[in-house]
Amino acid sequence: MKAQFNSINKSNQSIKLLANISNKSSTKINFQIYRYNNNEIFKYAISIKDSKIELNINLLKLLKNSFSNKLIGSFIYDISNKYSASQIDINTSNKNILENTVLGFSQKDFIYSIYKKNSQKSIYQTKFKLSKINSNTLQSINFLKELVSEPSNIIYPESFSVTVKKNINQSSVDIKILKKDKIKKIGLNCLLAVNQGSAKEPIVMEFSKKNHKKNVDILFVGKGVCFDSGGISIKPSAGMEDMKWDMGGAAVTASIIKYLSNIKTNFSFAGIVGLVENMPSSTAYKPGDIIKSYKGINVEVLNTDAEGRLVLADIITYGCEVYKPKVVIDFATLTGAI
């Protein structure tokens, strides 16, 4: 299906969607207010006649916030998808609004179906070229979605590190990959304990802006439990397939580093992710175990499904010691036993 985005020379701040739909019907929705977090963003009206749909969006004020513009694109995608629009034309009077509308639309238009016949990455095809910065944003967001969509037999600590390394611009970012022996030598014992039950070896990835000053401005930290069974304190089987997502924090960190590696920044940054699997086996760590953390604090394990804080405790402490950041931003999926 095709999507066409146009900037037209009009003085009013409005956006119009014209689309062909498969069903013949007649519907009219008078102007309603679209709100986000209780803020009024825009007014919209929908008219459907025969096999044509027309969506009119009137901005309540000129949107200076690009996020609000992206909300419009997301909304247009939802309407197009709801009515199975086969060919759409989107027209607006403002090139900047159009750019961010397209970005919001494209962020929604993502399908990960590589394991299916006739797989595709999106529903709509468009010739519209995003600016370099917005294209980089979209690619980084989609990279994140791809990482978390993969099953755990495809994305595990080592394969995660290989995939991420290939996707980061190493002319501007240095990457270190620490394997089990190095992790053990450093003393990231809590992270090692979580991975004890897995046949896969743990990995710690470090990223840093080339030629960064000693004390970085921002350190990004990500929890990367590539599969979380709960360990000896095993989770219920229902829904356990979703535990491939427990590396979401590491995926977010990697996608941010990917984005930053392709732009010029006026701040220094570093990133660190701890990649493990939390599996039950004869070698797994157990409730009642006592582990000495990287900081030297003894930690008693009461529930092996509370593994995320153990991984984070070690990599945050280690990352802060190495990079001495002014700000730490950590990303983690922490649920269940917390």
Map each language-model feature to its residues.
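Short amphipathic alpha-helical segment within the helicase RecA-like ATPase core
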Residues: 1-217, 221-224
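Alpha-helical metal-binding/catalytic segments enriched in His/Glu/Asp
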Residues: 164, 218-220, 233-277, 308
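Buried hydrophobic packing segments
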Residues: 76, 252-260, 312-319
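Glycine/charged-rich beta-loop-alpha catalytic/anionic-binding loops adjacent to active sites
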Residues: 51-60, 142-146, 185, 216-219, ...
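Short, conserved micro-motifs enriched in small and acidic residues
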Residues: 66-71, 154-155, 240-251, 302, ...
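Fold-independent oxyanion-binding glycine-rich loops
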Residues: 21-23, 59-60, 178-181, 207-209, ...
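Short acidic, glycine/serine/threonine-rich loops at helix termini
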Residues: 98-103, 187-190, 230-234, 280-286
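A glycine- and small/hydrophobic-rich beta-loop-beta segment
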Residues: 263-270, 274-338
